[in-house]
């Protein structure tokens, strides 16, 4: 399973990319708005940092406008992926963009049927939302497993991006469930990096080294 970072914060992207485990970036209108910067400016800077897929999301709700927005996003950089909401209009846009050779990421997926429809429409990626399903008492990991099984059974090349990842356990369970990618907030990466036994082990090594020098 590969890692994308789910943020539009350039400093977070730089810090994560420096550690070598980031393969791409996902953004959405909320994340970009949080930065208080121009969308194109933010995306251009991100593409200069990470050499991998960068998802930028449309804000229109009808297919024709999504297609036009998608074409504009795709022209920003060859690594751009157009993020499209899981609706009938969204899938109509995915079909056209796919035919034009533009990569798409269908977002806000909450069922295996939605994922299958998106894949058959030509989506490069589907993004099932793990944490938001957990919030309403559903099991997001069952959804990941179901989608992975369906895609494998039918030889569907669409990749699964686990989204709405809230904590390190989500990450491990997504990897076990068959997700191709987990898109993870920087704060969760920070949690994944740390373990109290690692810290105490480092302290002991340093203490032993200092004692040996005396």
Curated annotation (Swiss-Prot):
<feature type="active site" description="Schiff-base intermediate with substrate">
    <location>
        <position position="83"/>
    </location>
</feature>
<dbReference type="InterPro" id="IPR033919">
    <property type="entry name" value="TSA/FSA_arc/bac"/>
</dbReference>
<dbReference type="InterPro" id="IPR013785">
    <property type="entry name" value="Aldolase_TIM"/>
</dbReference>
<dbReference type="InterPro" id="IPR018225">
    <property type="entry name" value="Transaldolase_AS"/>
</dbReference>
<dbReference type="InterPro" id="IPR022999">
    <property type="entry name" value="Transaldolase_3B"/>
</dbReference>
<comment type="pathway">
    <text>Carbohydrate degradation; pentose phosphate pathway; D-glyceraldehyde 3-phosphate and beta-D-fructose 6-phosphate from D-ribose 5-phosphate and D-xylulose 5-phosphate (non-oxidative stage): step 2/3.</text>
</comment>
<dbReference type="InterPro" id="IPR001585">
    <property type="entry name" value="TAL/FSA"/>
</dbReference>
<comment type="similarity">
    <text>Belongs to the transaldolase family. Type 3B subfamily.</text>
</comment>
<dbReference type="GO" id="GO:0005975">
    <property type="term" value="P:carbohydrate metabolic process"/>
</dbReference>
<keyword id="KW-0963">Cytoplasm</keyword>
<keyword id="KW-0570">Pentose shunt</keyword>
<dbReference type="Pfam" id="PF00923">
    <property type="entry name" value="TAL_FSA"/>
</dbReference>
<dbReference type="GO" id="GO:0016832">
    <property type="term" value="F:aldehyde-lyase activity"/>
</dbReference>
<dbReference type="InterPro" id="IPR004731">
    <property type="entry name" value="Transaldolase_3B/F6P_aldolase"/>
</dbReference>
<dbReference type="GO" id="GO:0004801">
    <property type="term" value="F:transaldolase activity"/>
</dbReference>
<dbReference type="GO" id="GO:0005737">
    <property type="term" value="C:cytoplasm"/>
</dbReference>
<keyword id="KW-0808">Transferase</keyword>
<dbReference type="GO" id="GO:0006098">
    <property type="term" value="P:pentose-phosphate shunt"/>
</dbReference>
<comment type="function">
    <text>Transaldolase is important for the balance of metabolites in the pentose-phosphate pathway.</text>
</comment>
<protein>
    <recommendedName>
        <fullName>Probable transaldolase 1</fullName>
        <ecNumber>2.2.1.2</ecNumber>
    </recommendedName>
</protein>
<keyword id="KW-0704">Schiff base</keyword>
């Amino acid at each position: 399973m590969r890692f994308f970072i789910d943020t539009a914060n350039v400093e977070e992207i730089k810090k994560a990319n420096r550690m070598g485990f980031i393969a791409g970036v996902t953004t959405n209108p909320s994340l970009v708005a949080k930065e208080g910067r121009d969308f194109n400016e933010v995306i251009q800077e991100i593409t200069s940092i990470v050499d991998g897929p960068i998802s930028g999301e449309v804000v229109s709700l009808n297919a024709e406008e999504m297609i036009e927005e998608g074409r504009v996003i795709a022209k920003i950089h060859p690594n751009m992926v157009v993020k499209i909401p899981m609706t009938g209009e969204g899938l109509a846009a995915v079909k056209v963009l796919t035919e034009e050779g533009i990569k798409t990421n269908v977002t806000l997926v909450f069922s295996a049927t939605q994922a299958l429809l998106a894949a058959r429409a030509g989506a490069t990626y589907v993004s099932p939302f793990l944490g938001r399903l957990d919030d309403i008492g559903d099991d997001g990991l069952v959804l990941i497993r179901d989608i992975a099984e369906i895609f494998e059974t039918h030889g569907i090349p669409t990749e699964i991006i686990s989204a709405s990842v809230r904590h390190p356990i989500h990450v491990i369970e997504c990897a076990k469930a068959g997700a191709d990618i987990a898109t993870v907030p920087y704060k969760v990466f920070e949690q994944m990096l740390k373990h109290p036994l690692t810290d105490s082990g480092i302290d002991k090594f340093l203490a032993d080294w200092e004692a040996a020098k005396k």
